[in-house]
Amino acid sequence: IMARRVAVIGGGCSGLTCIKCCLDEGLEPVCFESSDDIGGLWRFKETPEAERSSMYRSLVVNTSKEMMCFSDFPMPAHYPNYMHHSMFLNYLRLYAEHFDLLKYIHFQTTVLSVRQRHDFSHTGQWEVVTENRDGHKETQVFDGVFVCSGSFTHPVTPLSAFPGIDTFPGKCCHSWEYKDPHPFHGKRVVVIGIGNSGGDIAVEISRTFLSTRDGAWIVSRSSTRGLPLDMQLTRLNSLLMQVLPRPLLNWALERFYNQKFNHRLYGLQPSHRYSGTKQHSTTACT
């Protein structure tokens, strides 16, 4: 019996793990990566590239290494709890090398289309059209498709929502374009939004004004006794968050995070409670 062929679109973090999972299940993975290397989001580029994720030079991972690593491949012991993005990229390279995944990846190959075959209702098969760097197009049939192309490739810039933006004489840019603070030296800068990237950039840029519509709960990467925050995500705590009344849970969590600094004194007190809303907290090195 021939192994079922599975297409994996993207050679980043998710793509690599999908290749590994396919091999574990006796499937035949074929990965298509449009760039010339693995890593996806975690590959730093001096200049942002269209249709690709982008990050800034100083970015540090907000998840501790014990929680960030794959269950079958621990992080190197000398890695810090919260690592620089370059260290995580190196970890992905070590992972790909250890499990011999690179031979399943077709680099500089773009997926043009993915369609169900005419007999999909009987076979469950997909028709995938790709184009390599030489412009050669190829159509292949697969029994399954993993889409691992990422979700941060297109910056969202709702500038039309800000009255007067058309007459603003300064420069407007998205965090997708931001690499380091040097172009903003000596300038007055407003950072709109207090997500993780907004918080990081506000710290880096000199003389910054941070603008946030609703405020945010600021969560430190380090919790009690200096342990990584995500080590508090135990089964017991998870159970408590499910069974405790929402008002009591919010009171306890907000009291805990206000011990680091008083959100109201710093003008960051959110208009929403900590739990039970769509807006997530902001992780920072406080």
Task: Please name every model-derived segment.
Residues E66-M75:
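Surface-exposed beta-strand-to-loop junctions
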Residues A3-V61, P74-L227, R235-T286:
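Flavin (primarily FAD) cofactor-binding/catalytic cores of flavoenzymes
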Residues Q232:
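Active-site-lining helix/loop region of Rossmann-like oxidoreductase modules
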